[in-house]
Curated annotation (Swiss-Prot):
The gene is metN2. Belongs to the ABC transporter superfamily. Methionine importer (TC 3.A.1.24) family. It comes from Listeria innocua serovar 6a (strain ATCC BAA-680 / CLIP 11262). It catalyses: L-methionine(out) + ATP + H2O = L-methionine(in) + ADP + phosphate + H(+); D-methionine(out) + ATP + H2O = D-methionine(in) + ADP + phosphate + H(+). It is a peripheral membrane protein. Its EC number is 7.4.2.11. This is Methionine import ATP-binding protein MetN 2. ATP binds at G38, Y39, S40, G41, A42, G43, K44, S45. GO terms for cellular component: plasma membrane. InterPro entries: AAA+_ATPase, ABC_transporter-like_ATP-bd, ABC_transporter-like_CS, ACT-like_dom_sf, MetN_ABC, MetN_ABC_transporter-like, NIL_domain, P-loop_NTPase. Its main location: membrane. Residues 2-241 form the ABC transporter domain. Part of the ABC transporter complex MetNIQ involved in methionine import. Responsible for energy coupling to the transport system. It is an enzyme of class 7 (translocase). Keywords: Amino-acid transport, ATP-binding, Cell membrane, Membrane, Nucleotide-binding, Translocase, Transport.
């Protein structure tokens, strides 16, 4: 669906050169929700603007739905952009137009007239849950409602791709989740390819199938969201994963557990996918004659599946404890004995 090959974007001023995107290769499949996460200045917004030709690469090629966006200009590019919707952090609505008129704007530009345009606008208002707000102006809407207008406007011409550039960064947590649920619903209903640019790992965890982590213009890490959360390889990825896993709190928790539970062994268990929801603990305890005391745990859901972390106190003989850990590993549960 979308292919980036050796894409470079360089900005040149009188005194220096800035390499915003540094030799990026990506393949994004039809119908997937693909996340790009990075801190400010990582190059992610520059990258997404090359998907619809708002920025042109200095080197390399950008192909969307078998069309080389990086090589077309003028009317051909304008026509191609009708198939690539985009929503923004600050909504970019026309403040003198109502909700319905904002949604109708791209249809007007595309030459859609009369009853056909009105039907499409009403259809989109229902899709994004804005019934009753048709004649409201942007100043009368909440942040979440404004973004829903932005989403409806971006979908007006039935695009195949939706670009989301920090689309939830200006929203509160509850509204963020509501907008993300809407994007998930639209993705499933329309089989729409969605590219999400964000600096919030919660957004990636909630809706994305795969993620690229960017740093200094490069893709530092790429993979399924579940794999990246479970085994982040690069330091920048580990920092992002800590946004969701609260590792500083975990470090404090480990010291607390080791200080307060002196008997037996304290073990960290990592469950994946189907094992995250199965009664593995009770099975292992029963079959190996050990006591497993659950001290702390959490379960994290992603679009690829769930993974869970448990901290347990294992009580029994040395042989029984070792046998229980061996069985857990055989059941594809990762184990880590915490050292005192």
């Amino acid at each position: 669906m979308i292919t980036l090959q050796n894409v470079v974007k360089e900005y040149t001023s009188r005194n220096n050169k800035v390499l915003a995107v540094d030799h990026v290769d990506l393949e994004i499949e039809q119908g997937e929700i693909f996340g790009v996460v990075g801190y400010s200045g990582a190059g992610k917004s520059t990258l997404i603007r090359m998907f619809n030709g708002l920025e042109l690469p200095t080197e390399g090629s950008v192909e969307v739905d078998n069309l080389l966006i990086s090589q077309i200009r003028g009317s051909k590019l304008r026509k191609a952009r009708q198939q690539i919707g985009m929503i923004f952090q600050h909504f970019n609505l026309l403040w003198s137009r109502t909700v319905a008129e904002n949604i109708a704007f791209p249809l007007e530009i595309a030459g859609v007239r009369g009853e056909k345009r009105r039907f499409r606008v009403n259809e989109l208002i229902r899709l994004v849950g804005l019934e009753g707000k048709e004649n409201a102006y942007p100043a009368e809407l909440s942040g979440g409602q404004k973004q829903r207008v932005g989403i409806a406007r971006a979908l007006a011409n039935n695009p195949k791709v939706l670009l989301c550039d920090e689309a939830t960064s200006a929203l509160d947590p509850q509204t963020t989740d509501e907008v993300l649920e809407l994007l998930l619903d639209i993705n499933k209903r329309l089989n729409l390819t969605i590219i999400v640019i964000t600096h919030e790992m919660h957004v990636i965890r909630k809706i994305c199938n795969r993620v690229a982590v960017m740093e200094n213009g490069k893709v530092a890490e790429l993979g399924d969201v579940l794999d990246v959360f479970r085994h982040p390889k690069e330091k920048v990825t580990q920092r992002f994963v800590r946004q969701v896993t609260d590792s500083d709190e975990t470090e404090e928790l480990i010291h607390l557990l080791l200080d307060n539970y002196a008997e037996g062994k304290i073990v960290k268990l990592l469950f994946m996918s189907e094992n995250a929801t199965q009664p593995v603990i009770s099975q292992v305890a029963k079959e190996n004659d050990v006591m497993l005391n659950v001290l702390h745990g959490n379960l994290t859901q992603t679009q690829n599946g769930a993974y869970g972390t448990l901290y347990v106190q294992v009580l029994g003989t040395e042989e029984a404890i070792e046998a229980s850990l061996t069985q857990l590993r055989q059941l594809k549960v990762e184990t880590e004995v915490l050292e005192r």
